[in-house]
Amino acid sequence: MVVKKIALFGATGNTGLTTLAQAVQAGYEVTVLVRDPSRLPSEGPQPAHVVVGDVRQPADVDKTVAGQDAVIVLLGTRNDLSPTTVMSEGAQNIVAAMKAHGVDKVVACTSAFLLWDPSKVPPRLQDVTDDHIRMHKVLQQSGLKYVAVMPPHIGDHPLTGAYTVTLDGRGPSRVISKHDLGHFMLHCLTTDKYDGHTTYPSHVYE
């Protein structure tokens, strides 16, 4: 099936904003769920539909997923490193809504820390990483076509489209531009070769 309509969760984060812009420019009809619509860009590419709500509210998620062909998940906690369940709760609601509406493809971003020895995760990032782990398990057990994107450090470098994607392990670099990360998330909608895999996009920038 050709994906034309997508739900984007986490659209107002750094990677979310560039993914939204690239998706609209690529011709996708994008629906976003946001708590604060004022965080969406006032100029440039705009989502086709904006649902104001919270990913922890099943009804808000259901409204966002209905009628879509695929889902992109870029949920995060910004700079809040305290214990959280927002990503795993959100993933549970997203999976339930996808099953209810017959949507079977999801591309979800967590973190490269899931590829590390757990004892090497920096203590200050442990709580967020724990919720990423819970979120990943929700996807693994969903029965859906899921792509788990586990990026290294996310930088501000320009879009290259020339990044390396390593399956089920870590790659040649410890950085990926937010623009290249968004590009890869969208690329995953056009192929099934990453379905069921963990993917590590990275690039050696100039």
Curated annotation (Swiss-Prot):
Residue numbers binding NADP(+): 10, 12-15, 35, 38-39, 54-55, 75-76, 78, 87, 109, 132, 153-154
Family: Belongs to the BLVRB family.
Xref: PANTHER family: FLAVIN REDUCTASE (NADPH)
Function: Enzyme that can both act as a NAD(P)H-dependent reductase and a S-nitroso-CoA-dependent nitrosyltransferase. Promotes fetal heme degradation during development. Also expressed in adult tissues, where it acts as a regulator of hematopoiesis, intermediary metabolism (glutaminolysis, glycolysis, TCA cycle and pentose phosphate pathway) and insulin signaling. Has a broad specificity oxidoreductase activity by catalyzing the NAD(P)H-dependent reduction of a variety of flavins, such as riboflavin, FAD or FMN, biliverdins, methemoglobin and PQQ (pyrroloquinoline quinone).
Protein location: Cytoplasm
Keywords noted in UniProt: Cytoplasm, NADP, Oxidoreductase, Phosphoprotein, Transferase
GN (gene name): BLVRB
Residues at the active site: 109, 188
The EC number(s) this enzyme carries: 1.5.1.30, 1.3.1.-, 2.6.99.-
Protein's name in the database: Flavin reductase (NADPH)
Keyword Cytoplasm: yes
Modified residues (Phosphoserine): 42, 82
GO terms under biological process: heme catabolic process; megakaryocyte differentiation; negative regulation of insulin receptor signaling pathway
Residue stretches in coiled coil: none
CDD domains: BVR-B_like_SDR_a
Superkingdom, taxonomy of origin: Eukaryota
One Gene Ontology MF term: riboflavin reductase (NADPH) activity
Catalytic activity: reduced riboflavin + NADP(+) = riboflavin + NADPH + 2 H(+); bilirubin IXbeta + NADP(+) = biliverdin IXbeta + NADPH + H(+); FMNH2 + NAD(+) = FMN + NADH + 2 H(+); FMNH2 + NADP(+) = FMN + NADPH + 2 H(+)
Any one Pfam family match given in the protein's UniProt record, by short name: NAD_binding_10
Classification of source organism: Eukaryota, Metazoa, Chordata, Craniata, Vertebrata
Keyword Cytoplasm: yes
Subunit-structure text: Monomer.
Organism of derivation: Bos taurus
Organ and tissue specificity: At least expressed in the liver and erythrocyte.
